[in-house]
C-alpha cells in the first residue's frame, strides 16, 4: 500500500501518546504580525497545573507534550519570540522535537538520539522560548503553516503513562477523568461514534 503524506506524522503521534501525554492542559493563542499560533501544553503525569511541583509520579518529569500549530503559510515571529510555560516541575529541562515543520515538510524524530542536534532547554521557570528562526510558516505537501511537537528528553523507551480503564459509574454523561483522557478514540476521533436512527434508541 502507498502511504499518505501524513502517515508518518500521525503514526508517530499515536505511538508516542501513551508515552508522553498526561496531566493538566493549557492552551493559548498568540498573535504575531496579525497571524496566530496555538500552543497546547500537557504538563505530564499527575501534574495538573503549571505551578505544581509536589505529589507527582516518578514518570512526571519525563512526560508531557507541547504542540504548536499555525494555519498560515506566511506565519512569522518576525523579531519576536514565543515563550511557552511547560510547568515549574520541568525547569531547566531538556526537550526535543517529536515532529518538526520544515521547508521540506514535517520531519519525525522517533527517539532522543534521532533529535540529538535539536535539543532545547527550559529556563528556571519551566519556559521554552522559540525564535523566528525556529518557527515559521511553510507550504509543503503535508503542511500549510507550521506544526511542531516537543517532548522531554530522557523518557525510557517502554514508558507507558496511560491510565487503566475505570468502570466507576458517574451521574453525568460527559465527565473529564484520567481514564477517559487516555482513550484516543474518544478525544480525537468522534466521527466513529454511532448515531441513533430512531427515537426509541435515545
PLM features per residue range, with description:
Residues 30-89:
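Carbohydrate-binding surface patches
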Residues 85-104:
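Solvent-exposed beta-hairpin/edge-strand motifs
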Residues 24, 34, 81, 104, ...:
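Intrinsic-disorder/low-complexity loop/linker signature
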Residues 46-51, 73-79, 103-108, 136-141, ...:
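Short, surface-exposed beta-strand/loop "edge" segments at domain boundaries and coil↔beta transitions
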Residues 1-51:
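Aromatic- and carboxylate-lined catalytic core of secreted/periplasmic carbohydrate-active enzymes
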Residues 111-200:
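C-terminal beta-strand-rich structural cap/linker in extracellular carbohydrate-active enzymes
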Residues 1, 65-69, 150:
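Short hydrophobic-aromatic micro-motifs
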Amino acid at each position: 500500500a502507498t502511504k499518505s503524506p501524513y502517515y508518518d506524522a500521525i503514526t508517530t503521534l499515536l505511538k508516542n501518546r501513551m508515552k508522553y501525554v498526561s496531566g493538566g492542559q493549557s492552551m493559548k493563542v498568540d498573535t504575531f504580525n496579525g497571524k496566530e499560533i496555538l500552543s497546547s501544553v500537557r504538563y505530564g503525569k499527575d501534574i495538573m497545573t503549571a505551578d505544581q511541583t509536589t505529589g507527582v509520579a516518578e514518570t512526571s518529569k519525563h512526560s508531557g507534550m507541547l504542540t504548536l500549530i499555525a494555519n498560515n503559510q506566511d506565519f512569522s515571529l518576525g523579531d519576536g519570540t514565543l515563550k511557552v510555560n511547560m510547568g515549574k516541575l520541568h525547569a531547566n529541562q531538556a526537550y526535543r522535537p517529536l515532529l518538526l515543520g520544515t521547508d521540506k515538510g514535517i520531519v519525525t524524530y522517533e527517539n532522543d538520539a534521532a533529535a540529538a542536534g535539536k535539543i532545547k532547554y527550559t529556563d528556571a521557570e519551566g519556559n521554552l522560548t522559540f525564535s523566528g528562526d525556529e518557527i515559521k510558516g511553510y507550504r509543503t505537501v503535508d503542511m500549510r503553516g507550521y506544526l511542531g511537537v516537543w517532548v522531554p528528553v530522557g523518557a525510557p523507551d517502554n514508558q507507558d503513562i496511560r491510565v487503566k480503564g475505570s468502570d466507576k459509574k458517574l451521574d453525568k454523561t460527559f465527565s473529564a477523568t484520567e481514564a477517559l483522557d487516555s482513550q484516543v478514540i474518544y478525544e480525537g476521533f468522534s466521527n466513529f461514534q454511532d448515531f441513533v436512527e430512531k427515537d426509541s434508541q435515545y
